[in-house]
Amino acid sequence: MLEDDFTNKELNKNFKHSILILAFKYEMDAADEVTRTVASKLKKSYSYLLSSEWQTESKNYNKIDEKELNDIKIEFEKIKHKPILYFETSGNLNQLEYTVDYYAKIYTNRKLIITIDHTLLSQKVEEYNDLELMNNTALCAIRLRKKYKAMIILLNQLNAEIEKPIRRENPLLQYPVKSDIHCGNQVFWACDNVIIAHRPELLGIEKYGKQKYPSKDLLHFAVIKSRKGRVGNIWLKAKLSQSEILTMSSSQLNEEKNIDLKNFKEIL
């Protein structure tokens, strides 16, 4: 869905150039990625589009009717004509760079947006470990950015530090930090912006951080580096039943917290 957002003219009114998105999807199948995007457009869950969403009333899985099927086909057809190219087979960094060069020569009038998801799945050639791979990935990204004035988005993963009991149980330690990024030092320096996405609910945290925000469906994007902007926190709510991600303000989160506290007192 990230790539699709860049093609949304309403979201990107200030774009002055046509774009081409080269999406290196080593982890998730491109078909799954596109299906999730279509589900979001139709405000349905991913499971619903696969006819695998359990219906409590009928005690059976959902069935897609003819109208819904037609709507789905229309959305898939729209995506076919968007400037996004998906690459599912992982290669080494030299092959990735060659691929970018190849398409840059074909689409000379477009600005490039390159996403790599995720970086640790690139094949190693001269690299002996993940640290060397991440360091070379950073160097590769810098070369491509300078060569084509491209936007490079690197998706990495967290290590296990944030899952430790001391982190989960201490509200002051629950926010993700730089050291939580796997091989973070090797790529942090190369990035203009670094954002860590975190779902505290998945770690069994009910009240998140020193603010004690309710964690149900909460997404926390910690902006820990912003070369031309400000560091801070972005709060979102996941409505998975409709494949939506909604923005939340701190005041809205505080309101939810107060409602939870009121309900707790009423139960007592």
Language model features with spans:
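Walker A/P-loop NTP-binding active-site region of P-loop NTPases
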Residues: 1-58, 118-123, 190-192
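Phosphate-binding/switch loop-helix module in NTP-utilizing enzymes
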Residues: 81-144
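Structural recognition of the conserved hydrophobic beta-strand(s) that form the central parallel beta-sheet
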Residues: 23, 115-116, 150-157
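C-terminal regions of RecA-like/P-loop NTPase motor modules
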Residues: 12-16, 43, 47-63, 67-77, ...
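Hydrophobic/aromatic beta-strand patches that form the interior of the parallel beta-sheet core
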Residues: 22-24, 87, 153, 195, ...
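Glycine-rich, phosphate-binding/catalytic loops in enzymes
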Residues: 39-41, 131-133, 170-171
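Signature of the SF2 helicase/ATPase Hel1-core->accessory helical subdomain module
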Residues: 121, 157-164
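A short alpha/beta connector and helix-capping loop motif
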Residues: 127-141, 151-152, 195, 202, ...
